[in-house]
Amino acid sequence: MNKSLIIFGIVNITSDSFSDGGRYLAPDAAIAQARKLMAEGADVIDLGPASSNPDAAPVSSDTEIARIAPVLDALKADGIPVSLDSYQPATQAYALSRGVAYLNDIRGFPDAAFYPQLAKSSAKLVVMHSVQDGQADRREAPAGDIMDHIAAFFDARIAALTGAGIKRNRLVLDPGMGFFLGAAPETSLSVLARFDELRLRFDLPVLLSVSRKSFLRALTGRGPGDVGAATLAAELAAAAGGADFIRTHEPRPLRDGLAVLAALKETARIR
């Protein structure tokens, strides 16, 4: 288990996110939720101004910026580190101008025209792999070993980013989960069990985002609001496997579970 594990607390400023759409669309509600997640153990707040679920309507960058602007200002005043979850360069550029600590792109930063601006910034970049371009979709995983597919994606994307002057030590790898890997839950389970291969191959930190994902709902038969136990089990598996970052809707149970894992490890060490 990684002792320096960083927890991203998710705040969806959306009307149609699969698990909490509309709850935090108002700025005051989003700010209050961010502060709550920090009090419950999050290290960073990950603001998502558009849903990535397969049935979500597209959101313009202007709308994304309008949603995040007052929340960013309030969290910055609080000294809270912020990650922006958006794949739109205009939204990313605005967030960089407001001093976000991370950009989290579900498309993995494909727009080479934006690389010079990324290179001038200091934010860390969460580069996510997906079997499709953009929001999640209900499609099958590619043929062959999924880890080979993911590794090939990162080989190409890391080369493109670093070739444009973006320092390698700013990159964080996210293999994707749920519909981002395909409709079958077995694909996500395979990646969850083997993501350490990415850490070994690329010598870069890895972020896992399994919270309330479709593969957990498929495995348990539960709805989005009733997979807390399944989420925690998957997150603790990620932590035990050496994840550097975990992105979650619920930091408190994760922190509690991590404390138990750490205590068990220490007990085993001194026996």
Curated annotation (Swiss-Prot):
<feature type="domain" description="Pterin-binding">
    <location>
        <begin position="1"/>
        <end position="259"/>
    </location>
</feature>
<feature type="binding site">
    <location>
        <position position="174"/>
    </location>
    <ligand>
        <name>6-hydroxymethyl-7,8-dihydropterin</name>
    </ligand>
</feature>
<feature type="binding site">
    <location>
        <begin position="247"/>
        <end position="249"/>
    </location>
    <ligand>
        <name>(7,8-dihydropterin-6-yl)methyl diphosphate</name>
    </ligand>
</feature>
<feature type="binding site">
    <location>
        <position position="104"/>
    </location>
    <ligand>
        <name>(7,8-dihydropterin-6-yl)methyl diphosphate</name>
    </ligand>
</feature>
<dbReference type="Pfam" id="PF00809">
    <property type="entry name" value="Pterin_bind"/>
</dbReference>
<dbReference type="InterPro" id="IPR006390">
    <property type="entry name" value="DHP_synth_dom"/>
</dbReference>
<feature type="binding site">
    <location>
        <position position="213"/>
    </location>
    <ligand>
        <name>6-hydroxymethyl-7,8-dihydropterin</name>
    </ligand>
</feature>
<dbReference type="GO" id="GO:0046654">
    <property type="term" value="P:tetrahydrofolate biosynthetic process"/>
</dbReference>
<feature type="binding site">
    <location>
        <position position="174"/>
    </location>
    <ligand>
        <name>7,8-dihydropteroate</name>
    </ligand>
</feature>
<dbReference type="GO" id="GO:0046677">
    <property type="term" value="P:response to antibiotic"/>
</dbReference>
<feature type="binding site">
    <location>
        <position position="104"/>
    </location>
    <ligand>
        <name>6-hydroxymethyl-7,8-dihydropterin</name>
    </ligand>
</feature>
<dbReference type="InterPro" id="IPR045031">
    <property type="entry name" value="DHP_synth-like"/>
</dbReference>
<feature type="binding site">
    <location>
        <position position="52"/>
    </location>
    <ligand>
        <name>7,8-dihydropteroate</name>
    </ligand>
</feature>
<feature type="binding site">
    <location>
        <position position="18"/>
    </location>
    <ligand>
        <name>diphosphate</name>
    </ligand>
</feature>
<comment type="pathway">
    <text>Cofactor biosynthesis; tetrahydrofolate biosynthesis; 7,8-dihydrofolate from 2-amino-4-hydroxy-6-hydroxymethyl-7,8-dihydropteridine diphosphate and 4-aminobenzoate: step 1/2.</text>
</comment>
<feature type="binding site">
    <location>
        <position position="247"/>
    </location>
    <ligand>
        <name>4-aminobenzoate</name>
    </ligand>
</feature>
<keyword id="KW-0808">Transferase</keyword>
<feature type="binding site">
    <location>
        <position position="213"/>
    </location>
    <ligand>
        <name>7,8-dihydropteroate</name>
    </ligand>
</feature>
<keyword id="KW-0460">Magnesium</keyword>
<protein>
    <recommendedName>
        <fullName>Dihydropteroate synthase type-2</fullName>
        <ecNumber>2.5.1.15</ecNumber>
    </recommendedName>
</protein>
<keyword id="KW-0046">Antibiotic resistance</keyword>
<feature type="binding site">
    <location>
        <position position="51"/>
    </location>
    <ligand>
        <name>diphosphate</name>
    </ligand>
</feature>
<dbReference type="GO" id="GO:0005829">
    <property type="term" value="C:cytosol"/>
</dbReference>
<feature type="binding site">
    <location>
        <position position="247"/>
    </location>
    <ligand>
        <name>diphosphate</name>
    </ligand>
</feature>
<feature type="binding site">
    <location>
        <position position="174"/>
    </location>
    <ligand>
        <name>(7,8-dihydropterin-6-yl)methyl diphosphate</name>
    </ligand>
</feature>
<keyword id="KW-0289">Folate biosynthesis</keyword>
<dbReference type="GO" id="GO:0046872">
    <property type="term" value="F:metal ion binding"/>
</dbReference>
<feature type="binding site">
    <location>
        <position position="214"/>
    </location>
    <ligand>
        <name>7,8-dihydropteroate</name>
    </ligand>
</feature>
<feature type="binding site">
    <location>
        <position position="12"/>
    </location>
    <ligand>
        <name>Mg(2+)</name>
    </ligand>
</feature>
<feature type="binding site">
    <location>
        <position position="104"/>
    </location>
    <ligand>
        <name>7,8-dihydropteroate</name>
    </ligand>
</feature>
<keyword id="KW-0614">Plasmid</keyword>
<dbReference type="GO" id="GO:0046656">
    <property type="term" value="P:folic acid biosynthetic process"/>
</dbReference>
<comment type="subunit">
    <text>Homodimer.</text>
</comment>
<keyword id="KW-0479">Metal-binding</keyword>
<feature type="binding site">
    <location>
        <position position="179"/>
    </location>
    <ligand>
        <name>7,8-dihydropteroate</name>
    </ligand>
</feature>
<comment type="function">
    <text>Catalyzes the condensation of para-aminobenzoate (pABA) with 6-hydroxymethyl-7,8-dihydropterin diphosphate (DHPt-PP) to form 7,8-dihydropteroate (H2Pte), the immediate precursor of folate derivatives. Confers resistance to sulfonamide antibiotics, including sulfamethoxazole (SMX), sulfadiazine and sulfisoxazole. The type II enzyme is stable whereas type I DHPS loses its activity rapidly.</text>
</comment>
<dbReference type="InterPro" id="IPR011005">
    <property type="entry name" value="Dihydropteroate_synth-like_sf"/>
</dbReference>
<comment type="similarity">
    <text>Belongs to the DHPS family.</text>
</comment>
<dbReference type="InterPro" id="IPR000489">
    <property type="entry name" value="Pterin-binding_dom"/>
</dbReference>
<feature type="binding site">
    <location>
        <position position="85"/>
    </location>
    <ligand>
        <name>(7,8-dihydropterin-6-yl)methyl diphosphate</name>
    </ligand>
</feature>
<feature type="binding site">
    <location>
        <position position="85"/>
    </location>
    <ligand>
        <name>7,8-dihydropteroate</name>
    </ligand>
</feature>
<feature type="binding site">
    <location>
        <position position="249"/>
    </location>
    <ligand>
        <name>diphosphate</name>
    </ligand>
</feature>
